[in-house]
Amino acid sequence: MSTLYEIAASLKGNQQTVVDAITCEAPILRDLPMEESSHGLWNIYESMKNVTGGDLVELDAPLPTVGVESELQQTDLSIIGGEMEVGEDTARKLGGPAAYFARKATPVLRKTGMSAERRVLYNGFREFAIKNNNVISAGGSSNANYTILCVHYVPGEITGVYDAEGFGDGKTFDLAPIAGGNLYKNAEGQLVYGMRLKTYFGLQLANPDYVSAIVNCDITNDTADSRTFPTAMMIDDLLVNAKAGQNTFIFCHPKVKSYLGSINKLDRLTIQNNHFSTQIDAWNGVPILTSFNFDNGTEETVEI
């Protein structure tokens, strides 16, 4: 499956700068596998409820009946975007609205990507795992928690969804001046120039067996006598609960990855070339990807 970054960068319109800005602080969003939606702004898919497969039988014995029970479901695409405004006088002092928006675009796009990724992590994967009881509690109870996610991307089941038609011009991210680039009066009665960014995006979560989570991971209060951070066995269970295989990833805050390495690697640590490191990049072959768009130890305790 192609990723969000690969698809956006390959389409016409030379949007490399826009794509780089949106994904530079959103590494998980950047590498999210994407599929075309079936009907533009929504995607119709078949959710498997029960599968009966074949079996070994004796020679000349009747073959068992095989089949699939399923139901049609729909994923609606959402909008990633926002609007920027600049006052007439400010725009004039700074070289005009085009120059102003070009200067401000990069930090705005960066923040847009960060916000979108956070929604994918919390309102998408984490909420899906909790809703389907595919979740483990590490024991934290002081509202100073982190989350660790395991996501197994599967075509048609666990994937991002995009509208291939975009806005009719083939662009994934559409930036356009408001009011045709002319002055207009905003809600406060001020004369301004405006610019808006829009793209259509969805997250298809069709199989609860492929998304798992560990919540209530408290680093601050974790001790040998009172564990509030996942044990090695819990991390193993996290992978099992997502049926970890190809295209499976562990997602967490960088501090979680660092602490996970320090408590699980010190007893096997080797020092080479005078470099001391407890960094781990994978757990039993599953890559660990980090993002600062996870909350930094401020999550409320989840009742399991």
What positions do the PLM features span?
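Core alpha/beta structural scaffold of self-assembling particle/tube/pore-forming proteins
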Residues: 2-26, 30, 36-46, 66-304
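Glycine-rich, compositionally biased intrinsically disordered regions
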Residues: 44-68
